Amino acid sequence: MKRRTFLQGGAVAGATTLVAAPAIAQSMPEIKWRLTSSFPRSLDTIYGTAQTFAKYVAEATDNKFQIQTFSAGELVPGLQALDAVSTASVEMAQTPLYFYIGKEPALAYATGAPFGMNHRHQESWWHFGGGADLTNEALKPFKAHAILCGNSGTQMGGWFRKEIKSVDDLKGLKFRIAGMGGHVLAKLGVVPQQIAGGDIYPALEKGTIDAVEFVGPYDDEKLGFYKVAKYYYFPGWWEGGAMLHMIVNDEKWNSLPKQYQVIVNQAGAAAGAWMLEKYDSVNPGALKRLIANGTELKAFPQPVLEACYNATQDHLNELAAKSDLFKRTKESHDAYMKEVLFYTQIAENFYDNYLLSKTRSKT
């Protein structure tokens, strides 16, 4: 029987030993699903995660369960992935849930709230702090549920044609930004634009937008933003550890054999780890290339960050006052963040800062 590469990982081997047995694999039905992504095929990080996920599922079932992946626009536009799953036009989608905060604001926390947790703490909250249950409660009206399948790590703050020296420079700025960060910046005069990944560069090139945030150096380099915007800001305070999910139609999910459900969940975990590790391997080199090509790195000024932080708290509190689900999700997230940061500030931050002091001059 074909060797299943994703089963070699310790995190998934135990949960999938049973379904890997030849007799069981032979007894499983042949099933074909379609997966639509919100991202272009050119992004071998994010879209590559969808392909890796589908590959793992196929390998673990001896190709009995095949998931065909489609990039944004091939079946449905990138921003309509949740709708496609909800109506069962496709069985599943790869999409960041903060794309749909217009439908349910609490979904912001599923990807990551502004000034929220880093990637590891965010995923810990998902598994152990109630994040998954709260998200799936939010998705229930859409007849779907979420499987965690990736994280970008802390993102960059975006590409700007002009420098951001003060809060006044934000006023009137047409900024492509997804999720709750755009709502926060609107309070400071920004005109947020939500545009799917494959459509961003033309909008920036034509001047339809003045600035864009997407992910980080590697993906941003691939999409060519450095060709039309000189200043590259950090940090992406609206995405401290952005989670990515597979959204599955509940009826289609319930029709799967239990063994296939186990494989899908574990393939999501394995592909998600692959995604974060991929970013760690490719972002440093991409950032060096961008700098060599004339990109100017800029940190957001402290007064700008303070204004954004205060506007974030005001906005999140306003939403919590209007929605019980948002309030419960916010309280769960904030309590978990406070708890994990208690330890992080003692051990990890001290270690990381010391190590940076020893290596910074060598990079």
Question: Language-model segments: which ranges?
Answer:
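N-terminal secretory/targeting leader peptides
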Residues: 2-19, 24-122, 130-363
